[in-house]
């Protein structure tokens, strides 16, 4: 069943590659670009087609199979998705291309390119299109369109959807996937129109809207959003990424006119408070660097919204910011957006629960015989869920420190190494304080950071389990 489903997923990627083909046709690009795209499509059709010839008798997917499908799908899609860049000679290194598209599908936005203008329009579009596909999840997308989305596919969706608790918004899983994607695409379309009306060229509007929707961060120009020189666009992008950093289940509540459930959500309130407080502190701390408070606030709001939602759209160099402001951004890198959103990171809900666990622990010392319960949104969080979150945090911290230790062999700059690892593992994007690329790192570090991006997007376990002997043993 694993081989059969992976083959179908490779065929889906082949179909998706027809989108950049149409862009190449529109812009009348070189034959080399068409050869690169069709060669990749041919490889995917050959591999995918050979794998679906024999349909498995047992189509049930268990937890182990679900995890393997998710992990292998993301790795394979990233590998094959990078081939057009290699074949076209625009990113000659296979490792660099794998890094670039891993960054795309995981909506990280980290790049090895020093100059994005080397990319043709079609591959520039494909690069950002991977943000749109990966934003809600490659498998959620596949589940929304596949004809055999049975309840057993719950294990696939649970392994991919970010957050400590997975919940279906409606009874049928396929309907859940379709509703989530319809909401997602509706908001994406809205921002394409908004950006176009704000003065962006149509091509740019699509590229930036895809980066906004997926909270990715790939742009059309080397200087990122600063290229447009518009405060209106800066604010619109900031608001846009914050919109996509919210749990999509809450938007479904709004559709059902459950306004109280939307605004009463504890994670949403904590998310907005963190954004406002961080923006306020940085605005005041960097006030002396800008002509007035309005510009200081604009820059602070842009950076905070982009970092907490793990988007990473570039806007100039902030290395001249005070260390206090840079450490706030580093702190936000660890938090991330909401569970069930397109944002990466540890997630606000986990931070909220961890803070409540710490509070209860302190209270239990003061009152040893007092029975303490933990509530989020008036729902009791049982001990099992609390322990799972604590275990996740421990594993997350151990991997993060290990990555920093290994990648530090490439650089003596603590802030660069730390922020690079935070950026990749939390799917944020650029190295803190600069819009420069990840080309400074060695091939080994790039491979490591590529897997860190995929692991971070899938919340660690699926990639971690690939390296366990028991995962590959027969049932």
Q: What are the residue ranges of the model-derived segments?
A:
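Membrane-proximal intracellular helices of multi-pass ion channels
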Residues: 1-475
């Amino acid at each position: 069943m694993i081989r059969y489903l992976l083959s179908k997923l490779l065929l889906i990627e082949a179909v998706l590659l027809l989108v950049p083909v149409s862009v190449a046709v529109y812009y009348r690009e070189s034959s080399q670009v068409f050869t690169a795209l069709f060669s990749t499509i041919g490889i995917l059709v050959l591999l995918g087609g050979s794998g679906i010839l024999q349909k498995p008798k047992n189509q049930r997917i268990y937890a182990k199979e679900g995890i393997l499908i998710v992990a292998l799908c993301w790795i394979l899609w990233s590998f094959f998705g990078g081939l057009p860049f290699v074949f076209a000679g625009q990113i000659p290194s296979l490792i660099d291309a794998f890094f670039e598209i891993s960054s795309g599908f995981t909506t990280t936005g980290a790049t090895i390119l020093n100059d994005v203008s080397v990319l043709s329009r079609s591959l520039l579009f494909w690069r950002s299109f991977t943000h749109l596909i990966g934003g809600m999840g490659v498998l959620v997308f596949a589940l929304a369109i596949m004809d055999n989305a049975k309840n057993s596919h719950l294990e696939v969706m649970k392994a991919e959807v970010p957050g400590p608790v997975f919940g279906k918004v409606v009874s049928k899983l396929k309907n859940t996937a379709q509703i989530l994607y319809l909401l997602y695409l509706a908001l994406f379309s809205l921002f394409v129109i908004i950006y176009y009306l704000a003065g962006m060229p149509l091509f740019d509007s699509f590229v930036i809207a895809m980066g906004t929707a997926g909270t990715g961060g790939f742009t059309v120009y080397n200087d990122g959003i600063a290229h447009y020189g518009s405060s209106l666009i800066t604010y619109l992008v900031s608001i846009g990424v914050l919109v996509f950093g919210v749990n999509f289940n809450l938007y479904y509540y709004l559709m059902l006119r459950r306004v109280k459930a939307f605004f009463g959500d504890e994670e949403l309130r904590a998310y907005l408070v963190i954004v406002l407080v961080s923006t306020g502190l940085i605005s005041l701390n960097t006030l002396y660097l800008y002509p007035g408070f309005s510009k200081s606030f604009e820059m602070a709001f842009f950076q905070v919204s982009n970092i907490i939602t793990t988007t990473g759209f570039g806007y100039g160099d902030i290395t001249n910011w005070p260390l206090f402001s840079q450490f706030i951004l580093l702190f936000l890198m660890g938090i991330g957006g909401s569970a069930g959103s397109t944002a990466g990171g540890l997630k606000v809900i986990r931070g909220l629960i961890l803070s409540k666990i710490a509070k209860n622990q302190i209270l239990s010392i003061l009152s040893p015989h007092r029975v303490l319960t933990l509530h989020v949104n008036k729902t009791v969080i049982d001990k099992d869920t609390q322990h799972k979150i604590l275990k996740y945090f421990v594993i997350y911290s151990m991997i993060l420190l290990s990555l920093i230790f290994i990648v530090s062999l490439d650089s003596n700059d603590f802030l660069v190494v730390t922020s690079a690892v935070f950026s990749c593992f939390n799917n944020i994007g650029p190295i803190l304080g600069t819009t420069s690329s990840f080309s400074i790192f060695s091939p080994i570090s790039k491979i490591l950071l590529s897997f860190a991006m995929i692991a971070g997007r899938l919340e660690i376990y699926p990639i971690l389990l690939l390296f366990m002997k028991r995962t590959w043993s027969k049932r």
